[in-house]
Amino acid sequence: EVDYVDLTWLINKSKFKNNDFWDEKIFLYFEAKDFSKRVKNNQNKIFIVDNINTFHIGSASHDNKFDYCLKLNRSWHYNWSKHYYNKKHFGIFFAYKKSLGFLIKLIFRFLNSVIFLNLKKSKLIMFEIYGLLCSMLGLPSFYRPYKN
């Protein structure tokens, strides 16, 4: 028995009302962590099967020319989702305490990358900050690279 599983699931669908598997506000990151937390909170169990392997080849579905664009997307959504998850499951004070400390670190990393003229890194960090701030302000997970 485990607390969290990512990537591959076999579930008893009858345990879920109205197919409420996923929180539709979350996009890309923390979906499985959120689902696992809700499963455990409802007194259900999560098990892993040791002799079954799955493989996830990250970013294999796109052309390499989109790598940087996808890194920006990843930077934005990971930080948005992390704050949202913490706020949803541990409360607003816990979420803001964690996020404010991380935001300060991000600002210092951003300034450092600007000083050393690492513009690609600066932009990635800026997207991390942007995603985190949007979540902290209660904005939805709206960033999509093909729309922005």
Regions found by a protein language model. Give the residues of each.
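Short alpha-helical functional segments enriched in proximate histidine and acidic residues
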Residues: 85
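Alpha-helical structural context
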Residues: 88-89
